[in-house]
């Protein structure tokens, strides 16, 4: 796999690459579900979940704002036309994403540590430390390669980073759809779901990278064949 110091060319807009549209649709659907199912308590001061969050409720504000910005804006970074035609916007959104990750990860770890007083196991705090560290490491690698203008590696690491970040939605969707998020919380079930999502997140990111690379190779082969055909006609 070669690296590049220029703007990454987009795969041809063939039918196969339109796989990105259902992927983005699934992400949007997860966002909508989590906002409706899990986050409505934000506008309902009488929701009993506030009793659980009371010891660390003010830490939820920076954690939620930073995480919301990162998760909502990140899909725009993978939109080819935006990335290639509006590089300043791409860099701005990328900066917001990196800052968001560097806020949400340590704050989330602190919140989970405080949650031990509510019955969460220390092993869950350790899991959150691994999850947060994985997210930060992938993001910082992506930033490092962006600063070095090695955009292939930058894209690969940012895809891994976002795959880890998406576990926020995946965990809540799985718990909600299968009715596992009832109160009082079964911490063993929750931790199992969280570990499963986190353990597979980088793998999911690498699968996405492989799909992108295979589409890119196919696009280059088609372009090369077309050029050869045109040259032969001339």
Where are the predicted features?
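Alpha-helical membrane insertion/targeting regions
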Residues: 2-234
